Amino acid sequence: MRLHSLILLSFLLLATQAFSEKVRKRAKNAPHSTAEEGVEGSAPSLGKAQNKQRSRTSKSLTHGKFVTKDQATCRWAVTEEEQGISLKVQCTQADQEFSCVFAGDPTDCLKHDKDQIYWKQVARTLRKQKNICRNAKSVLKTRVCRKRFPESNLKLVNPNARGNTKPRKEKAEVSAREHNKVQEAVSTEPNRVKEDITLNPAATQTMAIRDPECLEDPDVLNQRKTALEFCGESWSSICTFFLNMLQATSC
């Protein structure tokens, strides 16, 4: 009876020890599994965050301002098309406004996480341009894409002699106004002189000194000198006439 009790007790001890080992192993494995589950669950969220950040960066890099080597102040912005993109440039230079469009397809290049480098190199190429929008052979090339992806080069698609050129409205209106005023002044001045001469026939008689003795008359000489000083050669005869009317002389 005593032997039977000892055997039963030993079996109970072995079972207890085995159970405790299982519990200990589960406790060790539990943190690893929860950590792995946490990593697996957070992986999609991290991917979404990276994609959002990348899209924001791309949008901020696809527009901007620049000044070319020949001092044209410009803005540029990118628009997505069905196939590729279009890059519109709007510039102001020497009181003229003009614009043009470059087009290409950098989609395959941008798939390799090169969008930041690509757009920075595009902006640098724009700043190096001369006669922008005027050269039909203009191509915006980038080092990062041009060898493996030649379709990523942006070519000028609407070249003109000066792009879509428009004069600035304010300055054009002012210059036209000034031109009209000058033309009116030039056209009316000769008519005024003719009217003065035709309305006053005595002027021609007075200006043509009939008596040679009048040439030596001090009053006449003084009038001619005063007219030359204040009116100049072109208007001296008319001024002499008015002085002769105001100052009665023997001639």
Swiss-Prot record:
InterPro entries, A to Z: FGF1-bd
Residues listed as glycosylation sites in the UniProt record: 175
GO cellular component: cell surface; extracellular region; plasma membrane
Origin superkingdom: Eukaryota
Region (Sufficient for interaction with FGF2 and FGF2-induced effects) residue spans: 210-251
Membrane topology: Peripheral membrane protein
Cystine crosslinks: 74-91, 100-133, 109-145, 214-251, 231-239
An example Gene Ontology molecular-function term: fibroblast growth factor binding
Quaternary organization: Found in a complex with FGFBP1, FGF1 and FGF2. Interacts with FGF1, FGF7, FGF10, FGF22 and HSPG2. Interacts with FGF2.
Other notes: Expression is significantly up-regulated in skin papillomas and carcinomas.
Protein name in the entry: Fibroblast growth factor-binding protein 1
Lineage, opening ranks: Eukaryota, Metazoa, Chordata, Craniata, Vertebrata
Name of the gene encoding the protein in the UniProt record: Fgfbp1
